[in-house]
From Swiss-Prot:
SUPFAM superfamilies: beta and beta-prime subunits of DNA dependent RNA-polymerase
GO cellular component terms, A-Z: DNA-directed RNA polymerase complex
Record-stated family: Belongs to the RNA polymerase beta chain family.
Function noted in UniProt: DNA-dependent RNA polymerase catalyzes the transcription of DNA into RNA using the four ribonucleoside triphosphates as substrates.
Protein name in UniProt: DNA-directed RNA polymerase subunit beta
Gene (UniProt): rpoB
PANTHER family the UniProt entry points to: DNA-DIRECTED RNA POLYMERASE I SUBUNIT 2
Length: 1387
């Protein structure tokens, strides 16, 4: 049992989850962002020495395009290596300034010029140079990219793997419903090659899905003639022609099977098969046994058979018959006459040897290779006159050259496996023995030498005809063995290669000049196309998305997303049901639950928790090995293709203490089916019960009790939870909350172990353990700067809070600070609320939610949102716009929040419509009235040639200004506010660096003191030779004088020298870093063209929960808050405690998400146990008793294989601390598919001294009467979703109108109105409310004169309206006239 105990880190000791899992975890949850981080690391290969780089990523792309030779061949540009520079701005600066985070790519190339005169290509001269090839975006630690100041994620694509696929049309093409088989060779890049049957059983080919050609044309173009084609595809029967009558057949008995002969088949006198009877397998065996080698058959048996070779008269050389002719009686007579001894015919029959290629040859118009090439040229380039050269080049470039065609390693591996070859490696072009043997360039000779006698195209056609003949099966394209994942790195490489190919064309042009004019590589290469391609991909590709940053879970899930859409993938409209459906191979690779609802359902998936990609890009999942019924801890990853061969048991298969499978028959999966097998036949077993689901679904407790549709909503809605002001860990979790928070990157984790030295709200300083300190200038101090109140992509607030205190001892990986939605390093998306399931005055009709006022008072669901408002001053034609506090026609009061530069103060509380940045725009000269002229004359020019264009707070928003940033264009003088911000920023950075240096210095001196105190000195300030160095002596010395000590001991002397060097090195480094930072702060900003100044104002908006906000549990139980009721009116328990939330019980049965009920019961038990611990602590119970109670909670009912909680590791103090943290409730973990059972929940309720039914008597808060039956009450983790009524609701009086129809716009963003749609019109019609209807359709909508007149009437106090002609009617008239139908209104 001991080996199942785990040791706890500092953070974990603060709070331990009671785990109900029966299976101990074999594999820890892997690093969740690995698919992104690893893929991009392989693309960059930044830390790999140039000569050791693998053929991947940037290196592979550069290698494939270089060397570039000039057209004459006298100059070439070769690739040597590349290196990435340092990024100019770090991540934080890029976010602030709206820049992209990337590093410059410098490629070393070598220009080689050959001597024209010499025949041996002697080198004239060589020049090597570094060339800048644009910025390459860098990935942040958390797997995101910063593009133009915003964080973006590039998610992976699931696309069809390159290779060869066989399929049929499911009988849809032809009216007879006949299955037409087809094959398609898909390369990684290059032309697709299809083969397909038509209803008449002829075989055709298509190139790039153009019009079809008989397949024999393609083979003829490769160099095969009719005889060779027939010999490749058919077996041949040989007939010997007797000179006078009859024919001898060389008999292969097997080939007669299924035939019906019109003569007796006999062995000597013994008749084996009578005439007219069908020959069966038994007859064939008899013939083989009898050893019949030849068979005499009548002439008419030969007539109508197909010749395999041309038949020539030996004496005259006359052609008697062509290959593929059906033999006629006349031809047979001619053969006899010419003395032809033997002829070969094709062995075909209707059952399993179809004459497909023979049929095809009959419809093939071409006779020679050139004709075939010309035919292909005409199909690819219709309308262009073909020449021999052009036709040959076009055909060669289609499939046989690396520049234009690439199967890739994956494609070649899939291709070879499918056509039944053993080796997985090979060429990335299509190889054909005949075609390459006829060419005599170097490359062709190499290919022929390596691959000799194979042919890719012939083998595909052979497999296709086999399938048509009924041997072999077609492929399933939704099988994950036929779909592979393309991750960031690979897509970036493809884009980079595309950019390089564009560069290559330009370089080729210039290389010829390089010879004559002596250009350098830098002058030859223009990096623009590469940079443009990369920028386009990262900025606006379909797969590059604005990161979903609502909470840590949404970040992690977004990065683990796998999409079938995007370039080279499917489109929403064309994707059918099969592609979207769950496939057996998804098990353990792609989540079967989490996918968006709506048009993208099934096309966008999430990786399963343990899934990873293999070297070929196929998804694989881990399994434990099983040998002779014993389950081992060895883990092996299998891809969908490999898994096909094995029998795999479920993770919850029963095992005993020795890990032997105990059941007689174990439930297993084999080749996509579920079945029962004896333990001896099992090969593997699942690693974990949550193997099938993704991270989001694995966070839903009791998932196994929820209906799949609701589980999907539950998983999706957790990603929309808004981080609350104070996060609360879920009382009922699943045990992977810690892993999600750790990998999301929102918490601060210790890089090295040590002791907390110093701490404040924005910084944590750790003094590192001696053992973990590196050599050199490493001073053994880690400084962590925390993120304070920053805006996320979704306008939620990112803020980190320290968790540790000075003096705490921490280990590597411990959580030092919590981020948004985390609580002591665990994901905490919502709040634990006391919930009752009961109706309450109709306020929970249709899933509405009734809240207690206490929830609002305690700020349980208060969230902070940070809005960024931008004001831009541009240079206009009439003059520059100006940011200032001097704004025409605005009251003093409106400006009282602005400083003299016209920018709002930090800390100002602003409401909708308030001015935040004053800005004036010059306006054109207009005709002045006499009054204005007078004002001009008195007050000078400035009075009215500018208009107010200030930045105001948008309607419906109020908040506090928390930050202001002013960006000024280079070369324009900064205003006072900008200078102030700059100075304070420099001060802050200086203080930061000073503090860091001081801490480092102190640490170095402290280490030095420990190394020299008590040692003998040879001399020093006020110290005689032979004296010992004491603490008191050192305290009396100035720090800088320590280095004057001369020590007797060499080690001590080295320590002093080393310390001095370290301090000097750090001082230098900090000075350099500060100078760099200072330069960045003071330099001008790189703003968009025409922009002089930009001011960003950040508003913090506090949103309390209110009716209209959307909330949800984790089981898809969503609803909208309908009412907030005073706490005294809420139902309460016998103890007097009122409930927080009342939910509708009718929302449970029909939705079948019973998990929420179990969660409520277990949550109540968890809270009850916490209260019990609180009572024990208040009563100051002995620690031993508390220890016993905790042991009873954690370890009472652990299963054989489950992990136990070892409380003996806890000192009494730590145990009391743990107890204090459990007062709020003992957190539980019920892992997915391995959770708490009903009995365990009941036991927990019993231990907490709560009713085992989970129900209790409630009383009505308004009357005090008991309700007529007991109610289910308990704690549920409830979330507030980012669908807030404040963001959705707005009011419009007069606003913008659409240009053509003159009807009000719609939507909050356009400040639009409410649409009065056709259904609403029907309602008014039904009531006969004619005048209301007229008003709705005219003056309140698009009757322009009418609505203006009505406004005047209201101003004048006349309450009447005249309805005119709606503008939409005029539009209709114009539309009809555009159809040339005149329509006039009669007066």
């Amino acid at each position: 049992m001991e080996d199942l105990m785990t040791s706890y880190s500092f953070t974990e000791k603060k709070r331990i989850r009671k785990d109900f899992g029966k299976q101990r975890s074999i594999l820890e949850v892997p690093f969740l962002l690995a698919i992104q981080v690893d893929s991009y690391r392989e693309f960059l290969q930044e830390d790999v020495e140039p000569n050791k780089r693998k053929d991947l990523g940037l290196h592979a792309a550069l290698k494939s395009v270089f060397p570039i030779s000039s057209y004459s061949g006298n100059a070439a540009l070769e690739y040597v290596g590349y290196k990435l520079g340092e990024p100019v701005f770090d991540e934080r600066e890029c976010r602030q300034r709206g820049m992209s985070y990337g590093a410059p790519l410098r490629v070393t190339v070598r220009l080689v010029i050959y001597d024209r005169e010499s025949s041996t290509k002697a080198i004239k001269y060589v020049k090597e140079q570094e060339v800048y090839l644009g910025e390459i975006p860098l990935m942040t630690e958390n797997g995101t990219f910063i593009v133009n100041g915003t964080e973006r994620v590039i998610f992976s694509q699931l696309h069809r793997s390159p290779g060869v696929f066989f399929d049929h049309d499911r009988g849809k093409t032809h009216s007879s419903g006949k299955l037409l088989y087809s094959a398609r060779i898909i390369p990684y890049r290059g032309s697709w090659l299809d083969f397909e049957f038509d209803p008449k059983d002829a075989l055709f080919t298509r190139i790039d899905r153009r019009r079809k050609l008989p397949v024999s044309i393609l083979l003829r173009a490769l160099g095969y003639n009719n005889e060779e084609m027939l010999a490749e595809f058919f077996e041949i029967n040989t007939f010997h022609i007797n000179p006078d009558e009859g024919v001898q057949l060389e008999l292969v008995p097997e080939r007669l099977r299924g035939e019906t002969l019109n003569f007796d088949l006999a062995d000597g006198d013994k008749v084996i098969v009578e005439a007219g009877k069908r020959i069966t397998a038994r007859h064939v065996k008899q013939l083989e046994a009898a050893g019949v080698a030849a068979l005499a058959v009548p002439d008419d048996y030969l007539v109508g058979r197909i010749l395999s070779h041309d038949v020539v008269d030996g004496s005259t050389g006359e052609l008697l018959a062509n290959a593929n002719d059906e033999i006629s009686e006349d031809q047979l007579a001619a053969f006899r006459k010419a003395g032809v001894d033997a002829v070969g015919t094709l062995w075909v029959n209707d059952l399993d040897r179809g004459p497909y290629l023979s049929n095809t040859l009959r419809i093939d118009p071409t006779k020679t290779q050139l004709e075939a090439l010309v035919e292909i040229y005409r199909m690819m380039r219709p309308g262009e006159p073909p020449t021999k050269e052009a036709a040959q080049n076009l055909f060669h470039n289609l499939f046989f050259t690396f520049e234009r065609y690439d199967l890739s390693t994956v494609g070649r591996m899939k291709f070879n496996r499918r056509v039944g070859r053993k080796e997985v490696l090979g060429e990335s072009v299509l190889y054909d023995k005949k075609y390459f043997a006829e060419r005599n360039d170097e490359e062709s000779k190499r290919l022929v030498a390596e691959h000799a006698d194979t042919s890719d195209i012939l083998e595909v056609i052979k497999v296709l005809t086999e399938i048509r003949n009924g041997r072999g099966v077609v492929d399933d394209i939704d099988h994950l063995g036929n779909r592979r994942v393309r991750s960031v790195g690979e897509m970036a490489e493809n884009v980079f290669r595309v950019g390089l190919v564009r560069v290559e064309r330009a370089v080729k042009e210039r290389l010829s000049m390089a010879e004559s004019e002596g250009l350098t590589p830098q002058e030859l290469i223009n990096a623009k196309p590469v940079a443009a391609a990369i920028k386009e991909f990262f900025g606006s590709s379909q797969l590059s998305q604005f990161m979903d940053q609502n909470n840590p879970l949404s970040e992690v899930t977004h990065k683990r997303r796998v999409s079938a859409l995007g370039p080279g993938g499917l489109t929403r409209e064309r994707a059918g049901f099969e592609v979207r459906d769950v496939h057996p191979t998804h098990y353990g690779r792609v989540c079967t639950i989490e996918t968006p609802e709506g048009p993208n359902i099934g096309l966008i998936n999430s990786l399963a928790v343990f899934a990873r990609t293999n070297q070929y890009g196929f998804l694989e999942t881990p399994y434990r090995k099983v040998l002779d019924g014993k389950v081992s801890d060895d883990v092996e990853y299998l891809s969908a293709i490999e898994e096909n061969e094995y029998v795999i048991a479920q993770a919850n298969a029963l095992t005993d203490a020795k890990n032997m499978l105990t059941e007689q028959f174990v439930p297993c999966r084999f080749q996509g089916e579920s079945l029962l097998k004896p333990p001896a036949e099992v090969h593997f077993m699942d690693v974990s019960p949550m193997q099938t689901v993704s991270v989001a679904a694995a966070l839903v407790p009791f998932l196994e009790h929820d209906d799949a549709n609701r589980a999907l909503m539950g998983a999706n809605m957790q990603r929309q939870a808004v981080p609350t002001l104070r996060s609360q860990k879920p009382l009922v979790g699943t045990g992977i909350e810690r892993a999600v928070a750790r990998d999301s990157g929102v918490t601060v984790n210790a890089r090295r172990g040590g002791v907390i030295e110093q701490i404040d709200a924005a910084r944590i300083v750790v003094k590192v353990n001696e053992a973990e300190i590196g050599g050199g200038t490493d001073a053994g101090v880690d400084i962590y700067n925390l993120i304070k109140y920053t805006r996320s992509n979704q306008n939620t607030c990112i803020n980190q809070r320290p968790l540790v205190n000075v003096g705490d001892v921490i280990a590597r990986g411990d959580v030092l600070a919590d981020g948004p939605s985390t609580d002591i390093g665990e994901l905490a998306l919502g709040q634990n609320m006391l919930i009752a399931f009961m109706p309450w005055n109709g306020y929970n009709f249709e899933d509405s939610i009734l809240l207690s006022e206490r929830v609002v008072e305690e700020d349980r669901y208060t969230t902070i949102h940070i809005e960024e408002l931008t004001c831009v001053a541009r240079d206009t034609k009439l003059g520059p716009e100006e940011i200032s506090a001097d704004i025409p026609n605005v009251s003093e009061q409106a400006l009282n929040r602005l400083d003299e530069s016209g920018v709002v103060y930090i800390g100002a509380e602003v409401r909708a419509g308030d001015i935040m940045v004053g800005k004036v725009t010059p306006k054109g000269e207009s005709q002045l009235t006499p009054e204005e002229k007078l004002l001009r004359a008195i007050f000078g020019e400035k009075a009215s040639d500018v208009k107010d264009s200030s930045l105001r707070v948008p309607p419906g928003m109020d908040g506090t200004v928390i930050d202001v940033q002013v960006f000024t264009r280079d070369g324009i003088e900064k205003d006072k506010r900008a200078r102030q911000i700059e100075e304070s920023e420099i001060k802050r950075v200086k203080k930061d660096f000073d503090d860091q240096f001081r801490i480092l210095e102190a640490a170095i001196y402290a280490r030095l003191r420990s190394q020299i105190v008590g040692k003998v000195a040879n001399g020093g300030p006020n110290l005689k030779k032979g004296d010992n160095v004491t603490d008191a002596y050192l305290d009396g010395l100035k720090k800088s004088d320590w280095f004057q000590l001369r020590m007797k001991d060499d080690d001590a002397a080295d320590a002093i020298e080393r310390a001095q060097k370290q301090i000097q090195a750090h001082e230098k480094e900090f000075e350099a870093r500060f100078a760099d930072k200072r330069g960045k702060i003071t330099q001008g900003d790189d703003l968009a063209p025409g922009v002089l100044k930009m001011v960003k104002v950040f508003l913090a908006v506090k949103r309390r929960i209110q009716p209209g906000d959307k909330m949800a549990g984790r089981h898809g139980n969503k609803g909208v808050v309908s009412n907030v009721v005073p706490v005294e009116d809420m139902p309460y328990m016998a103890t007097g405690e009122p409930v927080d939330i009342v939910l509708n019980p009718l929302g449970v049965p029909s939705r079948m998400n019973i998990g929420q009920i179990l969660e409520v019961h277990l949550g109540w038990a968890a809270k009850g146990l916490g209260r019990k611990i609180q009572r024990m602590l208040e009563a100051q119970t002995a620690v031993s008793e508390l220890r016993k109670f905790l042991d009873d909670i954690y370890n009472h009912d652990s299963a054989i294989n489950a992990e136990r909680v070892d409380l003996s590791q806890f000192s009494d103090e730590e145990l009391l601390n743990l107890g204090k943290n459990l007062i709020d409730g003992v957190p539980m973990a019920t892992p997915v598919f391995d959770g708490a059972s009903e009995a365990e929940i009941k036991r927990m309720l019993e231990l907490a001294e709560l009713p085992q039914s989970g129900q209790t008597q409630l009383y009505d808060g308004r009357t005090g009467e008991a309700f007529d039956r007991k109610t289910t009450v308990g704690y549920m983790h409830y979330l507030k979703l980012n669908h807030l009524v404040d963001d959705k609701m707005h009011a419009r009086s007069t606003g913008p109108y659409s240009l053509v129809t003159q009807q009000p716009l719609g939507g909050k963003a356009q400040f639009g109105g409410q649409r009065f749609g056709e259904m609403e019109v029907w309602a008014l019609e039904a009531y006969g409310a004619a005048y209301t209807l007229q008003e709705m359709l005219t003056v309140k909508s698009d009757d322009v004169q009418g609505r203006n007149q009505m406004y005047k009437n209201i101003v004048d106090g006349e309450h009447e309206m005249v309805a005119g002609m709606p503008e939409s009617f005029n539009v209709l008239v114009k539309e009809i006239r555009s159809l040339a139908i005149n329509m006039e209104l009669e007066e």
